[in-house]
């Protein structure tokens, strides 16, 4: 079990890194969008490639961050019911949900989306828009994002089993790390006192 917990920590580290990188992608999307709008209204120039790169980046933010959201224990769930159970009861509910809902859905989407990506790659599929981009990178984001979600679900499963065996702390507790803004607010508050 210790080897599995070590694997779980590795998966968590990868997912955390991807989640942190996605923050920068949001900034890039905003800059591209603003730049496109400024160019369109000031020099009357616009390209479909700018619009498409925005939705490529949006997909690159949204799909991998499903795993990050699972790591942070922020996914929508049946908290109304599970909050009435002890930590062990919640762990059993999470194990059931991972095994019978999350994993089958994620594996199904991964399996069904892979041939779509392969077809786009092999045919060098291009966007229908004039000046558009190649499509296969966008198609790759779907199986890639769901692969990350499957890996994170496996990590969450391992942590729940480890918790039930008394080998790790309760993984259902939400991370309570402060954001940079919250840390700055605390520093300012301490200086004012």
Stretch-by-stretch model annotation:
Residues 1-193:
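Alpha-helical transmembrane segments and membrane-interface helix-loop junctions
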């Amino acid at each position: 079990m210790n080897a599995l917990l070590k694997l779980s920590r590795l998966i968590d580290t990868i997912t955390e890194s991807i989640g942190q990188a996605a923050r920068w992608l949001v900034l890039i999307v905003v800059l591209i969008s603003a730049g496109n709008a400024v160019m369109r209204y000031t020099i009357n120039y616009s390209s479909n490639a700018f619009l498409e790169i925005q939705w490529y980046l949006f997909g690159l933010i949204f799909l991998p961050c499903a795993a990050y959201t699972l790591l942070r224990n922020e996914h929508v769930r049946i908290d109304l019911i599970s909050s009435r159970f002890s930590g062990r009861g919640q762990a059993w509910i999470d194990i059931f949900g991972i095994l019978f809902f999350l994993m089958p859905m994620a594996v199904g989407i991964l399996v069904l989306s892979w041939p779509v990506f392969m077809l786009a790659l092999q045919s060098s599929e291009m966007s229908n828009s004039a000046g558009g981009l190649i499509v296969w990178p966008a198609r790759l984001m779907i199986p890639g994002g769901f692969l990350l979600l499957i890996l994170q679900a496996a990590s969450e499963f391992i942590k729940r089993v480890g918790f039930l065996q008394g080998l790790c702390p309760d993984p259902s507790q939400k991370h309570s790390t402060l954001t940079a803004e919250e840390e700055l607010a605390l520093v300012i508050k301490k200086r004012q006192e």
